[in-house]
Each structure stands twice: as structure tokens, then as C-alpha cells.
């Protein structure tokens, strides 16, 4: 009996409850998302977008199927993207994009999981320069068969770390670096490629951690560089397309010194094998397989002053001529460009509005507006479902197209009627009209936003709702002019500002 009493609690503590958020048709969330939903699975060619959801603390697995897309974008604040669970997995077969080029502060991408597997396309794009991002993708099982692109618009001192320190990453695809410094802290196995574009640098910081001899470092356009730790037992690293008339540099973390007495030179090139050997202090070195056809007279010892790299005087070598066998190896995929994320814009027009609000015991309500517009730009159509997302009976999510017409006004006349008495009041106000189209069915939402904090717009039941004005056209959680929402489900008041009336046609859906 005593044993059974002990075993049952132990078994109970091992039980876990998991949930999955399945996206089977395109969905966009603006400003907020509940990351407590657990695992996220994007399927059936769907796309899932999180726009201006600044603190993305994922709490489950991520699975992106083939032909699906997951977009996380920040157009204002710094984006904080975190996975901090050594039991979770990330598997991408489609396209995953993190876009922070418009952020006003440095962003963070800190991924610590059990398994990271990419057979699709991943693009992590950052502003860079003085806004140096933190980039870390650590997993005990780290495999890339697709393309992983780490992109900075302007190079910064940011150092990208891939894998667990002292562990192993497996790369059979392409890791693209654009204006990015990456520090090797693991073994690298596989016959894949690391492509260095523009001002990128790769630092082989621990030469005792082997890099597969069939793995390729590709030096692309711009002035990319490679720097390796000099050791007494050198490796041979395969480098493609070295040259670019002196723009490319390969070096060590120590000066390339020649010791005349010992007959040791700081560098040598074997015209029969295509091996370039760099030597520091005459005894410790590294070897680079750059290929055949180079003219030894065109090599020159130089200094690598790349941003983020420890500058070593006379620690590198360049080739003052084009690569004799220039070109991108077939193993190195073309680095994908950074797409432009969806943005929300609005146009302003001058109008005069009149609102009529009637409250009776049955809580019926109506609204009528008239407007005179000036010659301003037409409203912009954006794609989002954060304002009013719909859930279909089978649990999938539908695509929503929203037309937002943001207008301004000087005076609104409000007439509140109850107990056979009506009381007109006036107040400055703003008006936003939202047309939501989902599966060819439209919902029109009109938002009135008084510019005073003390105007009472109406009575719903026995509640008096005192409405203020949200900051900008979009309020908390992405809702336009949140506050009182009246639809087929009745009226509901919130503690925030704005007045919202919905002419709901979704009889069988839920917001």
C-alpha cells in the first residue's frame, strides 16, 4: 500500500498537457498573439503572419509544411524572438521569414531547442549598423538541407552563433551570410556550402573542431573575408571563387611572418595541388584549397579590417586578379532576397458625421453617417485578420481582406435616447470604416472615436460606457477603435477607448 501511494503521485507528475495551433488557410495577426497555444503547425499551402508582435516567446514546436509560409515582421519596435526549451523542435519545409529591417532598435533572435531541421528556406533579416542584432540558433540536433540566410542591411558587430558550443552542425544545403559575421563554435559535417556575400566574415575560432573537407566556403560579390585560428595541426578548408581583384581576403588570427633563418615563409601556394598555406610564426598554420590556376606573383599579404573581425596587422592575404575559375559552385544555392512585409497605411479625408444612438429595453441600435470628402488619396487595402479573424467549424482559419478608410472630422452630433427622452450632445470625433471580406462575405465595421475623454456615447442595458480615444487609428491588440462592439451576439463594453458597431453577416462564425 505504501509503495502504491508513492508510485501514483510520481506517475501523475510525469503527465503533460499539450496543445496545437493548426493553420490550414492564410492568417495574419496584428500586434498580439497568444503564444501559450503550444505547438504551431502551418499546413495545406497556408501562410501565417505575425505583424508588429514584438515579444515572440514561443512555447512549443514549430512545423512549417512544404509550400507554406511563416512571416514574423516588426515595423517599429525591436523584435524579440525566443525559443527557450531544450525539449522542443523546429522543422521547416516551406519558408520562414523574420523581417526587422524597419525596426527602430536592435532585435533578438535567440533559438535554443532540441532539434532544428531546415529543408526549406529561412530568412532572418535585420537592420544592423548601430542596431546590432543578437543571433543564436542552438540545437543538439542541427541539420540544414535547404537555405538559411542571415541578412543585415548594414554590417554591425553582431556575431551569429550556429549550433551548441563544442557540438556538431550538419549542413548539406546553403548557409548564406550577407553583411554578417559568423563565428564557428562547432564541428561542421556535410558537403554543403557557406556563402559569404558583401561584407560578410566567417571566423573559424576553434580549429580543433573539424570542418568537413568537402564543405565549401564561397566568396561572393563585395569584400567578404575568412579568418582562421592558426594551429600546429592544420586543416584544409575548401574555398571557392577567391580573388575578385583583391576584394577577397583569407587570413589567420596571427600575423603571417616569414622566418628567413628557418626557411619559413608567411604563405605559399602549390601550383600542382591548388593549396594555399598561411603560416604564423613559422610553425603554426592553416591550409585552404582555393583551386588551380593562380599566379603566385599576384598574392599579397595585407590586413583585414572588416567590422567585427579582430584586426591582425599583416594577418591576411589577397589575390590581385580575378579568380581563374570564377563562378558559384552548384552546391551553393543562390541566396534568396528579403521580401517586403505587409504594411498598414491609411489615408485622411475631411468629413462631417452625424451619429444617432437609440437605446431601449431591447437594446436595439442603429447608426447613420453622412460625409463630404475632400480630394485626398483613396483608402489603402491591406490583408490582415487581426481586426476580425474568423474560425470555421472545422477549426481552420480563413483569409481576410480588410479595407480601412481612416477619416477625420471636427464635430459629431450624438443623440442618446432612453425613457422617452433624447439628449443631443456634440463632440469632436474621428471615424474609421472597415470593410472585412472573408470568403466573399463582407462585414462592415464603423468606428467612432471621440477626441475627448468625458463624452458618454450611449447606454447598453444598465451600463453607461464612458469612451475615450485610442492613440492612432489602431488600438491595443490590433483592433480599430476598440470599445463597444455591437453585432449579432449583442453588445459588449471594454475598458478601452473607441466606439465600434458591426453589421455582422457571419452568422455561424465567431470572432
Curated annotation (Swiss-Prot):
Q: What induces it?
A: Repressed by HAP43.
- Compositional bias per record (Low complexity), positions renumbered to this chain: 349-392
Query: What are the GO cellular component annotations?
Result: cell surface; extracellular region; fungal-type cell wall
Supply the InterPro entries for this chain.
Flocculin_t3_rpt, Hyphal-reg_cell_wall_N
| Recorded phenotype for the gene knockout or disruption | Leads to hypersensitivity to cell wall-damaging agents and highly attenuated in a murine model of systemic infection.
Principal localisation:
secreted
Give a Pfam family name. Flocculin_t3
- Describe PTMs of this protein: O-glycosylated.
The subcellular location is: Secreted, Cell wall
**Domain of life from the UniProt record:** Eukaryota
Signal peptide range equals 1-19
Q: List the carbohydrate attachment sites.
A: 245
Which keywords does this Swiss-Prot/TrEMBL entry list?
Cell wall, Glycoprotein, Secreted, Signal, Virulence
Q: Where are the transmembrane segments?
A: none
Q: Which residues does the annotated region (Disordered) include?
A: 349-397
Q: What else is known?
A: IFF11 differs from other HYR1/IFF family members in lacking a GPI-anchor.
Job description of the protein: GPI-anchored cell wall protein involved in cell wall organization, hyphal growth, as well as in host-fungal interaction and virulence.
Which family does this protein fall into? Answer: Belongs to the HYR1/IFF family.
Task: List the protein's name.
Answer: Cell wall protein IFF11
Can you name the source organism?
Candida albicans (strain SC5314 / ATCC MYA-2876)
Amino acid at each position: 500500500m505504501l509503495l502504491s501511494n508513492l508510485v501514483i503521485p510520481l506517475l501523475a507528475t510525469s503527465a503533460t498537457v499539450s496543445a496545437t495551433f493548426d493553420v490550414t488557410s492564410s492568417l495574419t495577426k496584428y500586434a498580439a498573439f497568444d503564444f501559450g497555444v503550444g505547438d504551431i503547425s502551418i499546413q495545406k499551402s497556408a501562410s501565417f503572419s505575425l505583424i508588429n508582435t514584438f515579444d515572440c516567446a514561443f512555447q512549443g514546436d514549430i512545423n512549417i509544411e512544404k509550400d507554406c509560409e511563416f512571416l514574423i515582421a516588426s515595423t517599429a519596435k525591436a523584435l524579440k524572438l525566443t525559443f527557450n526549451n531544450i525539449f522542443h523542435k523546429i522543422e521547416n519545409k516551406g519558408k520562414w521569414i523574420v523581417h526587422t529591417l524597419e525596426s527602430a532598435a536592435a532585435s533578438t533572435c535567440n533559438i535554443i531547442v532540441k532539434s532544428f531541421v531546415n529543408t526549406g528556406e529561412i530568412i532572418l533579416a535585420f537592420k544592423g549598423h548601430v542596431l546590432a542584432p543578437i543571433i543564436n540558433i542552438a540545437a543538439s540536433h542541427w541539420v540544414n538541407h535547404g537555405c538559411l540566410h542571415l541578412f543585415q542591411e548594414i554590417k554591425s558587430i553582431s556575431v551569429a552563433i550556429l549550433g551548441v558550443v563544442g557540438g556538431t552542425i550538419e549542413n548539406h544545403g546553403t548557409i548564406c551570410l550577407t553583411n554578417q559575421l559568423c563565428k564557428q563554435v562547432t564541428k561542421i559535417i556535410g558537403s554543403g556550402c557557406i556563402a559569404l556575400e558583401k561584407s560578410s566574415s566567417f571566423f573559424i575560432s576553434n580549429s580543433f573542431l573539424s570542418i568537413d573537407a568537402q564543405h565549401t566556403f564561397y566568396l561572393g560579390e563585395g569584400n567578404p573575408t575568412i579568418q582562421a585560428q592558426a594551429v600546429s595541426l592544420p586543416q584544409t578548408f575548401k574555398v571557392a571563387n577567391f580573388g575578385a581583384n583583391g576584394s577577397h581576403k583569407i587570413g589567420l588570427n596571427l600575423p603571417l611572418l616569414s622566418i628567413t633563418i628557418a626557411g619559413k615563409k608567411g604563405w605559399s601556394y602549390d601550383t600542382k595541388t591548388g593549396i594555399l598555406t598561411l603560416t604564423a610564426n613559422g610553425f603554426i598554420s592553416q591550409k585552404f584549397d582555393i583551386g588551380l590556376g593562380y599566379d603566385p606573383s599576384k598574392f599579397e599579404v595585407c590586413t583585414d579590417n572588416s567590422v567585427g573581425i579582430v584586426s591582425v596587422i599583416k594577418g591576411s592575404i589577397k589575390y590581385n586578379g580575378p579568380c581563374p575559375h570564377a563562378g558559384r559552385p552548384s552546391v551553393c544555392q543562390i541566396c534568396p532576397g528579403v521580401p517586403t512585409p505587409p504594411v498598414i497605411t491609411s489615408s485622411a479625408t475631411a468629413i462631417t458625421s452625424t451619429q444617432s444612438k437609440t437605446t431601449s429595453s431591447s437594446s436595439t441600435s442603429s447608426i447613420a453617417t453622412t460625409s463630404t470628402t475632400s480630394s485626398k488619396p483613396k483608402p489603402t487595402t491591406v490583408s490582415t485578420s487581426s481586426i476580425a479573424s474568423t474560425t470555421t467549424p472545422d477549426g481552420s482559419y480563413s483569409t481576410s481582406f480588410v479595407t480601412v478608410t481612416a477619416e477625420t472630422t471636427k464635430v459629431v452630433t450624438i443623440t442618446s435616447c432612453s425613457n422617452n427622452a433624447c439628449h443631443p450632445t456634440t463632440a469632436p470625433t474621428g471615424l474609421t470604416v472597415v470593410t472585412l471580406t472573408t470568403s466573399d462575405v463582407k462585414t462592415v465595421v464603423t468606428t467612432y472615436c471621440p477626441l475627448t475623454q468625458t463624452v458618454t456615447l450611449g447606454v447598453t442595458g444598465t451600463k453607461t460606457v464612458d469612451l475615450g480615444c485610442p492613440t492612432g487609428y489602431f488600438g491595443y491588440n490590433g483592433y480599430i477603435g476598440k470599445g463597444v462592439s455591437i453585432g449579432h451576439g449583442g453588445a459588449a463594453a471594454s475598458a478601452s477607448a473607441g466606439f465600434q458597431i458591426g453589421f455582422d453577416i457571419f452568422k455561424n462564425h465567431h470572432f
